[in-house]
């Protein structure tokens, strides 16, 4: 599996890894993974991992750095479609109002990714679309985003349908 890994630390001593991995065959149907490969497309997962937990909140400066790295990677890979799945592995600091409304951790991360994606798009010199995918997985909501060039919107839609079909089984 092809991957690109970036590591960096914040001033509090937390170490972060940004990993982009061409891992479409993990969750796409074999037919679609083969189709994408034949057409020269690659689906890259975006993974941000924190080692250590000195600072509970990921600083905006660090998120901006992550955005810049993703933008640079995207520019260098013209047939890449990126995806990010918003998980609920660890809690995130939310305002009291958001907690009161029952906002899920995944939904909070979903909104954050949408904002960060807008920053990434401003750095790029190409038209980019965000294809959000929401799946109601029996109480464990799943939020996924596909980031693709506008000229690949049809491919992003095919991927979205394939993901939905996989979860519907």
Task: List the predicted regions and their residue ranges.
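Non-catalytic substrate-recognition and accessory regions of acyl/acetyltransferase enzymes
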Residues: 1-169
């Amino acid at each position: 599996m092809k991957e690109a890994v970036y590591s960096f630390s914040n001033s509090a001593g937390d170490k972060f890894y940004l990993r982009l991995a061409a891992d479409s065959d993990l969750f796409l149907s074999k037919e679609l993974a083969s189709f994408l490969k034949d057409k020269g497309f690659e689906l890259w997962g975006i993974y941000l991992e924190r080692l250590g937990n000195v600072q509970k909140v990921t600083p905006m400066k660090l998120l901006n750095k992550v955005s810049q790295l993703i933008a640079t990677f995207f520019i260098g890979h013209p047939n890449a479609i990126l995806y990010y799945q918003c998980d609920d592995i660890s809690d995130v600091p939310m305002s009291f109002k958001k907690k009161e409304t029952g906002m899920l951790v995944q939904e909070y991360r979903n909104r954050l990714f949408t904002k960060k994606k807008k920053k990434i798009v401003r750095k790029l010199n190409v038209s980019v679309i965000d294809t959000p995918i929401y799946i109601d997985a029996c109480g464990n909501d799943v939020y996924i985003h596909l980031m693709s060039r506008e000229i690949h919107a049809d491919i992003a839609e095919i991927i979205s349908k394939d993901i939905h079909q996989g979860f519907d089984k």
